[in-house]
Amino acid sequence: MFNASDRVQVLSEALPYIQSFAGRTVVVKYGGAAMKDSTLKATVIRDVVFMACVGLRPVLVHGGGPEINLWLEKLGIEPQFMKGLRVTDAPTMDVVEMVLVGRVNKELVSLINQAGGSAVGVCGKDGKLLTARPQGESGIGFVGEVASVNPQLIHNLLDGGHIPIVSSVATDEEGQVYNINADTVAGELAAALDAEKLILLTDTPGILQDYKDATSLIHKLDIRQARELIAAEVVAGGMIPKVTCCIRSLAQGIQAAHIIDGRAPHALLLEIFTDSGIGTMITA
């Protein structure tokens, strides 16, 4: 248990990071175990509110896979995945939109407001924030990718002292609704906002050299090394869209992308405000 001296030391270590990142935008992709465990959820909410209180400009992009699967099961629809992406036919798309926009997003808004923040929930449709296009791969249905980002709505919310909570549902130019991978949305939004950092909360310690060995964490790598890991299939499955979105956002100018373990309490604060950090950092 921390004593008073330990707490002072922690705050002292955090001070230069607070000073350095004041006024900077940090995009956080929130998903996985940190959404399912109520204790972890509470720490993430507190971390985001803390970030806002000390002068950072957090933007939270959320998934909702477990909640979507729960409602698909209730409605007798079998969840299917292909290459880490949810196969989304028309009935599944209806459930995805209902769950992400109507349930998960508004719950997060409520929790952040209760914790002392001022959250506003939006999806890609709002303010023409995101325009979607088909992902293009056969057999995955209404799975989209980001065609364009109009970040003005998010800028307005941040300038007004709010914490934007973004769900990854958007429409194309004709109004067709698409489910976009939340990691992808977080990466494209981070680039459009010229964010200081992109942070992805996952269910692993980060990028592992051997996915069976939690101690084989790769602490730091650059874009070239990340691409080599994908080609060598060290990065596979659901980690592919995570690493790919980091690469894309770095190529568009953000300073650093982090893949961290959302199962660790206060993982966000450990990454941003400590010397050692946590997880894997990817740089240009």
UniProtKB/Swiss-Prot annotation:
It comes from the Bacteria. Pfam families: AA_kinase. InterPro entries: AceGlu_kinase-like_sf, AcgluKinase_fam, ArgB, Asp/Glu/Uridylate_kinase, Glu/AcGlu_kinase, NAGK-C. It catalyses: N-acetyl-L-glutamate + ATP = N-acetyl-L-glutamyl 5-phosphate + ADP. The record marks K29, K242 as: Transition state stabilizer. It is an enzyme of class 2 (transferase). Its EC number is 2.7.2.8. Substrate binds at G64, G65, R86, N179. Keywords: Amino-acid biosynthesis, Arginine biosynthesis, ATP-binding, Cytoplasm, Kinase, Nucleotide-binding, Transferase. NCBIfam families: argB. Belongs to the acetylglutamate kinase family. ArgB subfamily. Catalyzes the ATP-dependent phosphorylation of N-acetyl-L-glutamate. This is Acetylglutamate kinase. The gene is argB.
